Design a protein with these regions (language model features):
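DNA polymerase processivity clamps
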Residues: 2-101, 118-229
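Short, well-ordered, aromatic-rich surface patches in folded extracellular/luminal domains
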Residues: 100-110, 115
Length: 229
């Protein structure tokens, strides 16, 4: 789809995919001309995505992003025009009027990048797309609730399961190349319910202070809370 139109704009396929993904974190968000940001209701996940090029529209709020995406998907090559209280979504001689939501009624997303840079991270590694896909594929099969991370300082093991014990079903992958890791006295765990990241590879940094950063090779950055096991 074309990036900008004289009478409006069109989201790219990648931007639509990120919108759909962010809506799984929280369906309500403010859409900015420079990018997207979202925070979940528990405030344990904050995510950001910058557009390749800024748009020229005024930022607007959407209460139900999945519904908004369905409106876009129902039209061929939709073009969006932003008005003060509503959007016009057009395709040829067809159009939909879709009302926006006041920004002060939607979750405010805090800036966390600068704070994260000051946090000491015990784990710093690259998680390839195939390893992430394998973890995500197996997790629902064995009814896993957590992603556990263990390190002896030389390699990092990522395990999905309900618990790390001999009576629980688990699945793990090991990363030994290009890592920066301290030996962990106890595992760090991430709730799989919070790990709503797009498929792909990630540069991952994890701190026992309770936060992790997952930087995608396709653009989004996710800050996700972690816990000591």
């Amino acid at each position: 789809m074309a990036k900008n139109e004289s009478t409006g704009f069109s989201f790219s396929d990648v931007e639509v995919a990120v919108l759909k993904n962010f809506a799984s974190i929280n369906p309500s968000m403010v859409i900015s001309p420079t990018g997207l940001s979202v925070i979940n209701t528990a405030k344990s996940v904050v995510s950001f995505y910058d557009f390749n090029k800024p748009y020229s529209f005024e930022e607007f709020g959407v209460y139900e992003v999945p519904e908004f995406l369905s409106v876009l998907g129902a039209l061929d090559n939709p073009v969006v025009e932003v008005n003060e209280k509503y959007l016009i979504v057009k395709s040829g001689d067809q159009k939909t009027r879709y009302f926006t939501t006041a920004k002060d009624l939607l979750p405010k997303v805090p800036s966390v990048g600068a704070k994260f840079e000051k946090v000491e991270c015990e784990l710093d590694f690259t998680l390839t797309a195939d390893k992430l896909a394998a973890l995500f594929k197996m997790a629902p099969i064995i009814k896993a609730d957590w992603l556990f991370l263990e390190s002896d300082g030389k390699k990092i093991r990522l395990t999905v399961g309900k618990e790390l014990n001999t009576s629980s079903n688990t699945f793990d992958v090991t990363i030994a190349a290009d890592i920066k890791a301290n030996e962990l006295k106890s595992p760090i765990k991430v709730p799989l319910s919070d790990l709503k990241v797009l498929p792909g590879g990630y540069d991952v940094k994890i701190s026992s202070a309770g936060i992790s950063r997952w930087s995608s090779d396709v653009g989004p950055v996710y800050y996700i809370g972690v816990k000591a096991n």
